C-alpha cells in the first residue's frame, strides 16, 4: 500500500475508533428502552433489532446524508452543505436522538479541525456554526480531505453498529462472543448499504422504525437508565 493510502486508512480508523472524543459510548439509539420493553433479550433479537436500524432506520439515512455532505465538500458548496445538515437534524425523531447526532457531530468536527486541519475543512466548517449532525460532520471532513466516499461510508456504518453492540453488552443479557457474532453477521450488509448510499440522492431518504422512534420518547422518562438516548 502506498504511504499516502496507508495514511488515509489510518486517519479513517482514528476518526471512527471508540477512542475518538465524540462521546459515542453515552448513547444507545433507543436500545436501552428496547431492552427494558423486552424487544431485545438475546442474540437473535439483538441481531433483528440492529438489522432494522441498519436497513430501515437511522443508519441507512446517515449514510446517504454523509455521502451528500461529502459531495458538497468536494465541490466546496457551502449552501448544499448547510441544506444537508438542516435536513439531517430535522430527521431526528426525538429530543434524545437529536442530541445524539448533534452532540457527536459538533464534537467530531471540533476535534478533527484541531487534529487534522486543512484549509477546505476550515472554510466549510464556518458554514456550520451551530448544531452539526454526526454523519454530516464525517462526510464533510472526509470530503474536505479528499478521501474516497465508499470506504468512509462503510467505516461509518461499522462504527455505528459496533457502538450499539457495545451498548447491548452493557444493557442486555448478551455476552462479548455473541456481540462479535452479531457484528460479523451484519457486516456484509453494511458494505451494500454504503455502496447504495454513495449512488443515492436525498430523495432516497426514508425510515420505517416507528417502534424505535416511540421508544426513544419513552426513554426520556425511563426510571433507571445509563445512556443518554
UniProtKB/Swiss-Prot annotation:
Main location group: cytoplasm
GTP-binding as UniProt keyword: no
Pfam family, one: UreF
Keyword Transferase belongs to the record: no
UniProt KW keywords: Chaperone, Cytoplasm, Nickel insertion
GO cellular component, one term: cytoplasm
GO MF entry, a single one: nickel cation binding
Subcellular location: Cytoplasm
InterPro entries tied to this protein: UreF (IPR002639), UreF_sf (IPR038277)
Membership in a protein family: Belongs to the UreF family.
Complex and partners: UreD, UreF and UreG form a complex that acts as a GTP-hydrolysis-dependent molecular chaperone, activating the urease apoprotein by helping to assemble the nickel containing metallocenter of UreC. The UreE protein probably delivers the nickel.
Function according to Swiss-Prot or TrEMBL: Required for maturation of urease via the functional incorporation of the urease nickel metallocenter.
Name this polypeptide is given: Urease accessory protein UreF
Species of provenance: Methylobacterium radiotolerans (strain ATCC 27329 / DSM 1819 / JCM 2831 / NBRC 15690 / NCIMB 10815 / 0-1)
Gene responsible for this protein: ureF
